[in-house]
Amino acid sequence: VRTDIVPAELGHRAFYKLLTATVVPRPIAWVSTVSADGVVNLAPHSFFTVACVDPPMIQFTSVGVKDSLRNVRATGEFVVCLAPEPLFEQINATGTDFPPDVDEFAAVGLTPEPSATVAPPRVAESPVAFECRLHQALELGDSTVVIGRVQRAAIDADAFDRDPAQGGLPRIEALRPLARLGRDQWSTIGEVREISRIRYEDWPGHYSPTARPSSNP
């Protein structure tokens, strides 16, 4: 039995809460920007994903006009840092609705690290930073999708399983990314499963999963 819900009947705020409680888990873009007056801003945004592969682009969504969006529009630059589990409380603290003249790095005790290609700093304590220049800010209703072209990725060397020039990739246990759920809930990476995608030429002609879902809640 399912409950059918019509967004307009429930109301936009209640349906927003429903969306964020069911579109889960959501990776977090920890976005660093600089205002036109030179004030550094840092804020978490949980509507975040890869937007394009070639050229490499990532995107985050600002619900309403917040300092991150205002600064990106003014300067055309931002940095997205990974939000790691050890910085859980500081990441949450940067979501406080500080006035625009407050530097969140200083407010929560984080270290700004100079970026190589843009003015906004990286979070030194974060294992991953993507330096971006604005490609497009797309307005959708009450929100704005900010798409940035990645100029440089800075990743802790000890996070890699081997030399990235030889195909090495960061180990998930070294990154320990946080994700947002509904309400005031967050999640850690938890159990990691690995399975290869089936090529059509290897398709057996029938399909039967080896592990069937439990009927218990």
Region roles according to the model:
Residues 1-217:
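Basic, polyanion-binding surface patches
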